[in-house]
Amino acid sequence: DRDSCVDKSRCAKYGYYQQCEICCKKAGHRGGTCEFFKCKCKV
């Protein structure tokens, strides 16, 4: 789910969010972005 993406998809310092994006999409969201090194899913 959405919260597990935050734990699983740590974001690199310079905005590498491929894992975050994939995790969020699998959880049924439109994608994800990185904020403060954490993955945030778009609704």
From Swiss-Prot:
Cellular component GO terms held in the UniProt record: extracellular region
The keyword Lipoprotein appears for this protein: no
Protein species of origin: Centruroides elegans (Bark scorpion)
Protein's cellular compartments: Secreted
GO terms of molecular function: potassium channel inhibitor activity; toxin activity
Tissue: Expressed by the venom gland.
InterPro entries recorded: Ergtoxin, Scorpion_toxin-like_sf
Domain of life: Eukaryota
Entry keyword set: Disulfide bond, Ion channel impairing toxin, Knottin, Neurotoxin, Potassium channel impairing toxin, Secreted, Toxin, Voltage-gated potassium channel impairing toxin
Family assignment from sequence similarity: Belongs to the ergtoxin family. Gamma-KTx 3 subfamily.
Domain notes: The presence of a 'disulfide through disulfide knot' structurally defines this protein as a knottin.
Main function: Blocks Kv11/ERG potassium channels.
Keyword Disulfide bond: yes
Protein name: Potassium channel toxin gamma-KTx 3.2
